[in-house]
UniProtKB/Swiss-Prot annotation:
This is Putative RNA-binding protein YbcJ. Its structure and the presence of conserved basic residues indicates that it probably binds RNA. It comes from Escherichia coli (strain K12). Residues 12-68 form the S4 RNA-binding domain. Keywords: RNA-binding. Pfam families: S4_2. GO terms for molecular function: RNA binding. PROSITE patterns: S4 (PS50889). GO terms for biological process: translation. GO terms for cellular component: cytosol. The gene is ybcJ. In pull-down experiments interacts with CedA. Disulfide bonds: none annotated.
Amino acid sequence: MATFSLGKHPHVELCDLLKLEGWSESGAQAKIAIAEGQVKVDGAVETRKRCKIVAGQTVSFAGHSVQVVA
């Protein structure tokens, strides 16, 4: 499983994480995928586009998974 470092930031918004990981070409595509229930956070479907993802959470989409670290 890949990891994503928050660096100095306390969180990253879910739609931004999809873009930063290269799983979505644009913010609009990321938001559509989230709204359609294609994204899971810690194993549960997440439909909030701007959901704040913090260290320790795992995000999955289209066969990819990433563990968020501080």
